[in-house]
Amino acid sequence: MKKADASARARELRDRIRAADHAYYVLDQPLLADAEYDRLMHELQALEAEHPELVTADSPTQRVSGAPSERFERVVHREPMLSLGNVQSDDELHEFDARVRRLLGLPDGEPVGYVVEPKLDGLAVELVYRDGAFTSGSTRGDGVNGEDVTANLRVVGGLGANRGVPHALEGRPPPRVEVRGEVLLFKEHFEAMNRQLVRAGEEPFANPRNAAAGTLRQLDWRVTARRPLSFIAYEALLPGGDPWRTHWEKLEELAAWGFETNAENRRCRGLAEVLAYRDRMAERRFELPYDTDGIVVKVDDLDWRRRLGAASKFPRWAVAFKYPPQEEATRIRRIWASVGRTGVLTPVVDFDPVRLSGAMVARATLHNEDEMRRKDILEGDWVLVRRAGEVIPEVVKPLPERRTGAEQPFRFPAECPVCGARVVREEGEKVYRCTGAACPAQLVGRLCHFAQRRALDIEGLGEKLAAGLVERGQVKDFADLYAVPFEVWQQLFSRPRKEQDAGAARELPEKSAQNMVAALERSRKTTLRRFLFALGIPQVGEATAATLARHFGDLARVMDADEEALKGVRDVGPETAAEIRAWTQEPQNRRVVERLLAAGVTPEAEVVEARGPFAGKTVVLTGGLSTMSRDDAKAEIERRGGKVSGSVSRKTYLVVAGEDAGSKLEKARSLGVRIAGEEEFVRLLKE
């Protein structure tokens, strides 16, 4: 592959992986199947290995994914909570073992001692104990910064679901210890909880991982207390270093302090025993009381671990082996087209229900016509399906040997199944679109996009409430939301609970309506970048919205910018500039924006805090940072009134030197410019 093509492909892969990371770790809504995510990550790793110059400090291959949510206080982990590299074949496990042996300088034939355990599918957390008492707890977040969920962790296990988070340690614990482990829902508790939700007319959770993550990150700890979460410990860290010789001794100590450790943990001498354990667990995985999608292999000797160390993202002494997804055969009942907010018709497959990874599954999407044709999927086909990553239902392939001749290809409708408008597929596009400007399905999708957390954050306004507003003719555009009478909200919340949104409040209709009105009132005060993202302008995602907000500063300048001005914005190309200009000059869109402003929605520019050590100063970044991406560092400096430059001069205030800093560092030294390492830079940001 030519360097230019490799660079473009690497950039595309990084963007897709970052989007998937955000959806999985921050929103708790998986975007990609695990197998697809792993394929993209492996492709990016291979590209960067072949072209080392393409490696960027903020590449997903260089740091743990999952930035902490803005809803909780940020916590800095004393030691980073690194994620694990994953492998999917015997060859890769052999490579891991060989690498460990090579780095340790072990003679041929000397086996490595490992501890192996099931890979739990929950939420990784850290608990801090002082003098045996639980004092604080946080999520892993991005590995360096997590979220403070102390109040919620205090009630994990409060229903007696299993051994939870001890408030006080047993035996003789050290003065301070950090305990790491997984918060999860056992299968029986998950199923019981979902039965209760269904009986109450509420939406059940899709899987135990989403349920555990969503429960632990509730703002109200009482919600967490009502759900049967469990905690399983697998790591302990002492400020002065490990007093234990092996990881196994550490696990025994954790049990002595009162923690639940995994009963399936085993010690193995050499890789052959690891492989035998892997095979046994693969056979038993669906019999276990919790969801698991693989095993974790860890070097047992703690001195060896210290010698092996860690790369920027993964420890060198551990790896996760992931099982291939479970697949089952079933028969397609029908294929139909759903309509999204942009008018795109997506083929949806309904099939006979099958149990996959402990859950009943009966529906999957096929993305577009090309994928359906490539997979050769026909209505009436027998197909193999799986829950890729144990989460997202996916049609893998048809079973043509079981065809009877009655199967038929699916044809996209000529008219929209919702509004009856003409459906078209433009030349060069992969998707069919509804051309109806007033299509109710598109309007519902746009309203949900407008109300989502990353846009105007109208809490409780989901698809079913939006559909109710559209059905009543109450809302025809975003601005109408702010004119919905209180009694209409009451009527919507008076419907049977099974018809309400899963995320909506579960109080009396009047209280729920009051909450919705309050959420709408809060949404009136927003930032320019959130507002621009909420409008759903074609090709304007969060990143582009933020760039436009920073470049233009106020809404009027964005709305009046011509194509040339838009092309002058960083990362906005000709196609995106044309799309933005076309949208802003459409009279109906301008009327909606004017009505939103008249309704009291005030999109304010980002406030620049022109104070502190960076105010009015020029800063240069060089090398990779482990605690944040280069873009994040740049944004933090600019938010404090500083300017980030790409070159060093005598006017440069500070050069921030990360890992593998290059020629800019040498030039700074020659000019006598102040140099700060990452630790000092983070400290300066806090001043």
Swiss-Prot record:
Entry binding sites for NAD(+): D34, A35, E36, Y37, D38, S83, L84, E117, R140, E182, K298, K322
Residues annotated as the enzyme's active site: K119
Cofactor: Mg(2+); Mn(2+)
Top-rank taxon: Bacteria
Reaction(s) this enzyme catalyzes, per UniProt: NAD(+) + (deoxyribonucleotide)n-3'-hydroxyl + 5'-phospho-(deoxyribonucleotide)m = (deoxyribonucleotide)n+m + AMP + beta-nicotinamide D-nucleotide
Residue ranges annotated for the BRCT domain, each copy included: 609-687
Any one Gene Ontology molecular-function term assigned to this protein's record: DNA binding
CDD domains listed in its UniProt record: BRCT_DNA_ligase_like, LIGANc
EC number(s) per entry: 6.5.1.2
Binding-site list for Zn(2+): C416, C419, C434, C439
A Pfam family the protein falls into: BRCT
Keywords: DNA damage, DNA repair, DNA replication, Ligase, Magnesium, Manganese, Metal-binding, NAD, Zinc
GO terms (BP aspect): DNA repair; DNA replication
GO CC terms, sorted: cytosol
Protein family according to the UniProt entry: Belongs to the NAD-dependent DNA ligase family. LigA subfamily.
Protein function: DNA ligase that catalyzes the formation of phosphodiester linkages between 5'-phosphoryl and 3'-hydroxyl groups in double-stranded DNA using NAD as a coenzyme and as the energy source for the reaction. It is essential for DNA replication and repair of damaged DNA.
PANTHER family: CHROMOSOME TRANSMISSION FIDELITY FACTOR 18, DNA LIGASE
NCBIfam families for the chain: dnlj, PRK07956.1
Protein name, per record: DNA ligase
Source species of the chain: Anaeromyxobacter dehalogenans (strain 2CP-1 / ATCC BAA-258)
Name of the gene this protein is made from: ligA
